[in-house]
């Protein structure tokens, strides 16, 4: 298994439980920002920069986002296990986000 390279994204992030999905259209117009939108039968969630004001949502603030540099092969195993074990051992909550080419994880920085 190769050594992981990480990049800490510069802003703080919030996790929102949305009551209105229309907010996504305005985020799509912004350039060069990280956000993640997930919708299921149970809820719709958004992770975005804490400076972006989202109305009509429940939110959890104070998350830092870290990007894994380089593409990970789909068949590569144990990477998330290594990362989440380190976080768990230090008492840190972690959330992972995977896109087609890039992987991210968010860690709770404070309450």
Predicted feature residues:
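Helix N-cap/beta->alpha junction signal
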Residues: 50, 108-109
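Regulatory modules associated with amino-acid/nitrogen control
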Residues: 1-90
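A cross-kingdom feature marking solvent-exposed beta-strand/loop segments within repeated
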Residues: 77-78, 89-105, 111
